[in-house]
Amino acid sequence: MWHIFFIVNIVKIASWNVNSVRSRISNILDWIKLEKPDVLCLQETKVVDNDFPLSPFEEIGYNVKTHGQKSYNGVATLSKFLVEETLNGIPNYDDDQARYIETVHSSDLGMIRISNIYLPNGNPAPGPKYDYKLNWMKKLKNHLSETLLNEEIFIVLGDFNVIPDDIDTYSPEDWKDDALFKMETRKVYREILSL
């Protein structure tokens, strides 16, 4: 009698807008112990790199890569895998806000590139913050388009600050003037998804 076994390698990747990593450290650690992700991408860490609480994550086996700033924004990627490469910020885009980190992980599946984003909110719209949001999205789209040419495992995740469709909110009418819901935001978001 023959038995055929298939071994399926699964990589568990999660994303979480923590709204201050230092305020939520115990919640994050509890969740990690429960869910055991291979990679956890955090947004809105709200801490400069030198003050990021590395030790609690390193003590449970995570490699930590951060791109932070004081009191606002910030992204971090925690990985059980060796992180071979880290890119802070979208290339060729002069941006002083810490909203993008890209990491390459040496996993059981081979190399995995992960783009962890915290897309700008953009309110009030119209205005400079909305213009910044749209420009950021277009720069992101261009970078992702170029990176996809590498034909490697590439995962894009994070907090997109977009309401893609009417069904994604209880009351679309309440959101009609919000940057997250404006047609131009949704259009560029769909362009990113269609890459």
Question: Would you name each region that the model predicts?
Answer:
Residues 20-24, 95, 132-140, 181-184:
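Soluble or luminal CAZymes and related metallo-dependent hydrolases
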Residues 60, 138-195:
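Metal-dependent phosphoesterases centered on the DNase I-like endonuclease/exonuclease/phosphatase
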Residues 16-17, 32-50, 114, 143-166:
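Active-site beta-strand/loop signature of hydrolases that rely on acidic residues for catalysis
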Residues 45-48, 52-124:
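Structured beta-strand-rich core segments of catalytic domains in phosphoester-bond hydrolases
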Residues 91, 119-138, 173-178:
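Surface-exposed cleft-lining segments at the edges of enzyme active sites
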Residues 10-20, 111-123, 157:
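Active-site-proximal beta-strand elements of phosphoester/diester hydrolases
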Residues 30-33, 56-60, 94, 131-133, ...:
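Glycine-rich, phosphate-binding/catalytic loops in enzymes
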